[in-house]
Amino acid sequence: MTKPNADSLMKIGQLKKPYGIKGWLWVFSETEEREAIFSYSPWWMKTATGFKPLTVTQWRRQGTGIVAQFEQVPDRNVAETMNGVSIWIDKDSLPSTEEDEYYWSDLVGLSVINKQDECLGTVKELFETGAHPIMKVVPSQDSIDDEPRMIPWHKQTVDVVDLAAGRMVVDWERDF
């Protein structure tokens, strides 16, 4: 298997603590539907020495979560060293998005400009809250101030997303 280009990868999950004695691990999925993570392959794990393949041999629902066994993890001793390892896939293996739909990874790094043409910062991450996703916007060199912001990812807040220009326009005052 050829090594992936790190720039073409997208994080889709993370390995958590071991489950049982046979090397199974809890899997935290960042996909919209939790179990959809298993429909993508190949998986890559990010290590200190670069990206290495991670092959799922079997998986199942366990309580409110999911657990999986991997070819590279033969027993619990190895599994204990895997807690926190991130799971990545090649972006090219993802289906195309519809108009006005975006993968969160495409939004990270965009400049956030309000309707008053003030730069509020850069999108650092998005996370789900239950009601709607939230963008964590951190100060950038061009920001109007040094304040981090939490801005809802919602059609009433986000007016324009221009991936080619690397920016989005939001209806969000600087002092919210």
From Swiss-Prot:
Single biological process term from Gene Ontology: rRNA processing
GO molecular function: ribosome binding
UniProt GO cellular component terms: cytoplasm; ribosome
Gene3D superfamilies given in the database record: PRC-barrel domain, RimM
Compartmental location: Cytoplasm
InterPro entries documented for this protein: PRC_barrel-like_sf (IPR011033), PRC_RimM (IPR056792), RimM (IPR011961), RimM_N (IPR002676), RimM_N_sf (IPR036976), Transl_B-barrel_sf (IPR009000)
Keywords: Chaperone, Cytoplasm, Ribosome biogenesis, rRNA processing
Residue ranges occupied by any PRC barrel domain in the UniProt entry: 99-176
Cited SUPFAM superfamilies: PRC-barrel domain, Translation proteins
Superkingdom in the source lineage: Bacteria
Domain notes: The PRC barrel domain binds ribosomal protein uS19.
Family of the protein in this entry: Belongs to the RimM family.
Complex formation: Binds ribosomal protein uS19.
Function: An accessory protein needed during the final step in the assembly of 30S ribosomal subunit, possibly for assembly of the head region. Essential for efficient processing of 16S rRNA. May be needed both before and after RbfA during the maturation of 16S rRNA. It has affinity for free ribosomal 30S subunits but not for 70S ribosomes.
Protein name in UniProt: Ribosome maturation factor RimM
Species whose genome carries this gene: Psychrobacter sp. (strain PRwf-1)
